[in-house]
């Protein structure tokens, strides 16, 4: 990409805009914006790419200003005096023997006819590939015009020099580049960035109890390709997607956040409500916009929770046309996000993680794209004891508590069930202390009076109140599906 050619085209666009030749100015602006876009795609340094994106945004703003001027001028040409209706009372008396005056002809501005200009020079054959689509100059600038616009040219040249200086200096302020949502509704882009993008979730492997096999598989599928990009190439390329299957409350979302934290990637937490809209075609746009944003903020982890609600089996009798279009767009986008391929930058990997409680309802094509399908089981006895320690590490415990004994009594409980037991047990002392007190007395209690240690009786009482949320029949269905379709 010839940088001098980019600067020359930007200079010409501004020069024509200052002289009032807006058509030629818009052509040059369009060309230079396309050149910068192609140049940004070839860059590898994030700091340099961010500076080029900033220059492109400034040129887009100038182009929009020229475009608004052209539309304003066109509106002046198309305006005509309003026809005021004349009421029947104001109509004068007409003699039938006298002809009425002729109806005034409607005057409209004649269409502009572009006549050939003898002073127009032909296009140079040695123009770069990025400027071949540009239209030649409409008018040659005369010497008098150049003398009149010399001061304006100096100002435009100063802005070009400033943009080049910013790109050469690099991103010294450390700001995160902003996604350019050109072609999309601004509200859609802002909603996705506000509701989905989560940088550095701060969930580590140590915050998740047990699940050692799942952690090992996720490290190999997601984390290691980021650490060893030269190794994971060719047949060793990273997996396109990972599906986590298991009963509810086993830590699938926590695993996805831990993956994003360990990789240092941008984390997109997507649900079915995020990618649905009541307007026709908006859902497909949201899916495409999501993956474009993921490629922009790469390396990225897209976690689609409850994916069976978005991409269930196609061809059923109760399937709607809009739902089928969304599924097709999702499948197309997922097939195009394979990360570290031969010709792609390994640091720009987009990993798709998905979780479901109903794997038997997922479409076959989606199951093929999610190449790794791992089972997230209920915690073991060791995992339950570790989970009790993690959940109760912020509260004071009675010395007589043996968490291993409590863990033996929670056979068949999920991780969410054990967390609920710990939360309920930590509130037992407070409930006993405020029993029978008035609101004024409760507000007068000191903080030390409420910070009572959790006893063994509190945990056993909470265990009696909270039952299991997963049945043995459901566990059997998960294990049967993994035997048939698992890919661990």
Curated annotation (Swiss-Prot):
Pfam families: AAA, AAA_lid_3, KATNA1_MIT, Vps4_C. The modification N-acetylmethionine is found at residue 1. Signal peptide: none annotated. One of its GO terms (molecular function) is identical protein binding. One of its GO terms (biological process) is microtubule severing. ATP binds at residues 246-253. Residues 142-167 have a biased composition (Basic and acidic residues). The modification Phosphoserine is found at residue 172. One of its GO terms (cellular component) is spindle. It catalyses: n ATP + n H2O + a microtubule = n ADP + n phosphate + (n+1) alpha/beta tubulin heterodimers. Its EC number is 5.6.1.1. CDD domains: Kp60-NTD (cd21748), RecA-like_KTNA1 (cd19522). Its main location: cytoplasm. Keywords: Acetylation, ATP-binding, Cytoplasm, Cytoskeleton, Isomerase, Microtubule, Nucleotide-binding, Phosphoprotein. It comes from the Eukaryota. It is found in: Cytoplasm, Cytoskeleton; Cytoplasm; Cytoplasm, Cytoskeleton, Spindle pole; Cytoplasm, Cytoskeleton, Spindle. SMART domains: AAA (SM00382). Residues 128-179 are annotated as: Disordered. Regulates microtubule dynamics in Sertoli cells, a process that is essential for spermiogenesis and male fertility. Severs microtubules in an ATP-dependent manner, promoting rapid reorganization of cellular microtubule arrays. Has microtubule-severing activity in vitro. Belongs to the AAA ATPase family. Katanin p60 subunit A1 subfamily. A-like 1 sub-subfamily. Interacts with KATNB1 and KATNBL1. This is Katanin p60 ATPase-containing subunit A-like 1.
